[in-house]
Amino acid sequence: MSEVNLSGMTALSIGRGVTLNNASELEAALRHIGATRYHNHHPFHKLLHSGKLNKGQVQAWALNRYYYQSTIPLKDAMVMTRFRDRATRLEWRHRIEDHDGDVGTEGGIERWIKLTEGLGLDTAYVESTEGILPATRFAVEAYVHFCRDRSPLEAIASSLTELFAPSIHEERISGMLEHYSFVNNDTMSYFKRRLTQAPRDANFALHYVREHATTPEQRAAVCNALIFKTNVLWVQLDALYHAYVEGHIPPGAFVPKEG
């Protein structure tokens, strides 16, 4: 795969003067972004996966992450409205089913509730989202707005964090089962299911952007969409670290009962 110099990459973009001349250079740039900016590198995740958080801190993470998980189907429905092409809509529709489930079938949101219930959180409180951090709400809503307002190509590109998700799910499953007595295989079922779902989603999105980003400007937009998405994920962990590791919980947010 082509080598791409992204030394000028900023907090918001791949930087001026970076020209991606073909699909191979685009994919190389996307994988570089994931390798350097995906939230598996965040200090909060390192604490979570190594057993360094207490139960209350894990509860705070699961509670806040629920807002992101439960909003994904809304985001994906928004993406579907951007396409006149039936084949693309059919492919994208299964993402909504993966999270919402169907009549008589369990989806990702229900699996996430298994996690929060297993951690001792009241389901009505979790679903109300009244205890989440303001930064969580702002970040997730910004993601939905991005998929609504930017080009369809950028909307699909923003989902490419799924390329890097299986590794963090594997790390999370093994690390949390090893270190925390209050989680088990059933409560971790969301992550186990995503080990097979995420690669399918990522492969479609990667093929789509390789095929449809045909100019250097479009390839840059694809990369910048992925950078935006990594920022959405990263800032949520910044907020969790500030509130529940450093102890600066904002007014009205969830306050753990267990340390």
From Swiss-Prot:
Q: Which GO terms describe its molecular function?
A: pyrroloquinoline-quinone synthase activity
Q: What class of enzyme is it?
A: oxidoreductase
Q: In which pathway does it act?
A: Cofactor biosynthesis; pyrroloquinoline quinone biosynthesis
> Which reactions does this protein catalyse?
6-(2-amino-2-carboxyethyl)-7,8-dioxo-1,2,3,4,7,8-hexahydroquinoline-2,4-dicarboxylate + 3 O2 = pyrroloquinoline quinone + 2 H2O2 + 2 H2O + H(+)
Q: Which InterPro entries match?
A: Haem_Oase-like_multi-hlx, PqqC, PqqC-like, Thiaminase-2/PQQC
Homology family = Belongs to the PqqC family.
Role description: Ring cyclization and eight-electron oxidation of 3a-(2-amino-2-carboxyethyl)-4,5-dioxo-4,5,6,7,8,9-hexahydroquinoline-7,9-dicarboxylic-acid to PQQ.
- Please report the name of this protein according to its UniProt entry: Pyrroloquinoline-quinone synthase
